[in-house]
A protein has these predicted regions:
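Catalytic histidine-centered segment of alpha/beta-hydrolase-like enzymes
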Residues: 152-165
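Conserved alpha/beta-hydrolase catalytic His-Asp/Glu region
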Residues: 35, 43-46, 61-116
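Short beta-strand/loop motif that positions the catalytic acidic residue
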Residues: 114, 120-122, 126
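Conserved alpha/beta-hydrolase "acid-adjacent" motif
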Residues: 127-133
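Catalytic histidine neighborhood in serine/cysteine hydrolases
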Residues: 138-155
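Conserved alpha/beta-hydrolase "nucleophile elbow" surrounding the catalytic nucleophile
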Residues: 9, 13-18
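Flexible "cap/lid" loop of the alpha/beta hydrolase fold
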Residues: 19-65
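Conserved acidic catalytic loop of the alpha/beta-hydrolase fold
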Residues: 1-9
Length: 175
């Protein structure tokens, strides 16, 4: 941003891009922020989630010993394809490690440092970044306001495009 000579940018972030926007805005001066179904709140995990994760890790270590490396790799990839998101499945092993670390990093501690006006536009049916995350962000970011897109999921800005555009224009005071 500095290399481009941009001062006080308006940031727009969806999902992982929201995470990037939150971090940037907590460390830099920005004019405003628009977060749509943004990541940044560490998800609450059920016992079943941890059981799945640790059984997969155990499988990765034991299967090669029990059935051989080639067969084990095939079974591990089949299981990963069923359990992982499409982004995760397409990623290289290095990117998978980075994605896992990022998804599990909670940014709530930096949110109070954001001084810019912040619009939160969220689908109430979002399962990737649930509405409860938006409500938490609204509490933690000092000048944040939440608009809920009823019936929309993780891509609320596409599912309710006209409403999103109107909301953003009003927020930015664009006619």
């Amino acid at each position: 941003v500095k290399e481009l000579g941009i001062e006080h940018p308006t940031l727009v972030g969806h999902s992982f891009g929201g995470r990037v926007s939150i971090l940037y805005a907590s460390r830099n001066d920005v004019r405003s922020i628009i977060l749509t179904d943004a990541a940044g709140v560490k998800p609450r995990r059920s016992f079943g989630y941890y059981r799945k994760v640790y059984s997969f890790k155990l499988m990765k270590h034991l299967l090669p010993i029990l059935i051989g490396k080639r067969k084990a790799q095939m079974l591990i990839e089949q299981r990963r394809a069923k359990a992982g998101s499409s982004d995760y499945n397409r990623a290289t092993p290095m990117m998978r490690a980075i994605l896992s670390k990022c998804v599990n990093e909670d940014l709530c501690h930096v949110m109070p440092k954001i001084s810019a006006p912040t619009l939160l536009f969220w689908g109430d049916k979002d399962t990737a970044t649930p509405l409860s995350d938006a409500k938490k962000m609204e509490r933690l970011i000092p000048d944040a306001g939440l608009v809920v897109a009823e019936g929309a999921g993780h891509f609320a800005m596409l599912e309710q495009k006209d409403r999103w555009i109107a909301t953003v224009k009003a927020f930015l005071k664009i006619e």
